[in-house]
């Protein structure tokens, strides 16, 4: 017989209170497809009130026993959570920050399958930041989401205090401080881009409304599902109570791809490349800015003297990297996208190194570059590490950049016209050209 010691909450015993949160720790409590896995609460223990949870070595589940007058049953002292919650862990948790709630949509998809385990490990928000994961799926994926939750459970992450799965964004987004919106319909063969904008736009309009109603008022939202700039715009327009500044479209993967290509050409390790801006849309019109990027602190054009390659080979390789990868893999980037989501969030929760910046798709109102207001456009940003950011204001734009930035801007304006019915800006009119409106994965 192995013994694991558990601490009970200082307040009323959750084991005695049928409506307590811990009641939900019984696996897969299901209400309207909203299911909840939960660890014991933090900072609510006293060393004097302990429960012993005894585990038979050859039985499947631990059996809680009574101590200090507190009643426990096998059902309430739930499986792995009993085993992982011991006094030593509790000592460590004393210095932990207050738990934060993180929603992830498309949680049964490829990108999430990489991302969720990074979030739970502490790699993103830090080793003293406990988290609750709120996973949004659909009727299609609810079974798979249970599988995801089980894998998270089996990973024994100390910082992962709670896992909820559900299909209703109004429930899943309740009190979330971060929302990572990945779930979106992929473009199928023969599908018009306007149709994709409409189908995915509806998803992001609904999720914007739900965030507006249920999320923490200062929630930070990172839109990954494509076309991510316009989806982010739809989302923010449907969430008027949340600052527009809090919405991001993921262009960090493009930034990382650009750094990699420059490092390769210059023959340096990629950590030597800094100040990399991606301007514009996450599409083949995006502009990887080699004018302002630096290698070993020097302007790229001084280090790489083949300027034709910069203007053509480099630029195109970044714009079309996603498509090439699909050709090789047979599916779009998932692991590197998850890594870039981690990078994007870390850039907001840690101070930007002196003199450097990062790229993210943000709302253009008040931008110093003359880019049309009312778009979500990738630009250079800096953060103090408080979750917020400022636009970098003094980046040089030459004629080459200006022309290409204008093309991406025109593309986003066209996308915006296609979704006017979803942003509350009138009747949609879709005049997207066939060539200039490709996702990176469509080439
Ligand atoms: N911004 C960027 O840099 C990148 C963006 N992407 C984009 O990220 C998104 C997700 O990619 P990935 O995880 O690989 O994709 P997957 O297809 O593996 O999973 C995405 C999830 O989207 C949801 N989904 C699929 N079809 C529909 C639909 N018709 N309606 C609503 N939801 C749907 C599904 O979840 P459920 O059934 O639970 O709703 C699915 O699990 C895609 O839009 C992709 O283009 C990809 C790479 C880079
Ligand atoms: O088009 C896609 O789905 C893939 C994508 O965004 C990328 O690889 O950058």
From Swiss-Prot:
One Pfam family from the UniProt entry? Ldh_1_N
The answer, when asked if NADP is one of the entry's keywords, is: yes
The residues the record assigns to binding NADP(+) are 106-112, 200, 207, 224-226
Q: Which residues form the active site?
A: 282
Mind listing the UniProt keywords for this protein, alphabetically? Chloroplast, Disulfide bond, Isopeptide bond, NADP, Oxidoreductase, Plastid, Transit peptide, Ubl conjugation
- Gene Ontology molecular function, alphabetical: L-malate dehydrogenase (NADP+) activity
Q: Which positions hold the covalent cross-link Glycyl lysine isopeptide (Lys-Gly) (interchain with G-Cter in ubiquitin)?
A: 213
Q: Where in the cell is it found?
A: Plastid, Chloroplast
User: Transit peptide residues?
Assistant: 1-52
Summarize the record's disruption phenotype note: No visible phenotype under normal growth conditions and high-light conditions in short days.
Q: Name one GO biological process term.
A: malate metabolic process
Q: Where is this site: Activation of NADP-MDH?
A: 77, 82
| Modulation of this protein's activity | Chloroplast NADP-MDH is activated upon illumination. In order to be enzymatically active, disulfide bridges on the protein must be reduced by thioredoxin which receives electrons from ferredoxin and the electron transport system of photosynthesis.
GO CC term, one of those recorded: chloroplast envelope
Give the NCBIfam families listed for this entry.
Malate-DH_plant (TIGR01757), MalateDH-SF1 (TIGR01759), PRK05442.1 (NF003916)
The entry assigns this protein to a family as follows: Belongs to the LDH/MDH superfamily. MDH type 2 family.
* Role played: The chloroplastic, NADP-dependent form is essential for the photosynthesis C4 cycle, which allows plants to circumvent the problem of photorespiration. In C4 plants, NADP-MDH activity acts to convert oxaloacetate to malate in chloroplasts of mesophyll cells for transport to the bundle sheath cells. Plays an essential role in the regulation of catalase activity and the accumulation of a hydrogen peroxide-dependent signal by transmitting the redox state of the chloroplast to other cell compartments.
Q: What is this protein called?
A: Malate dehydrogenase [NADP], chloroplastic
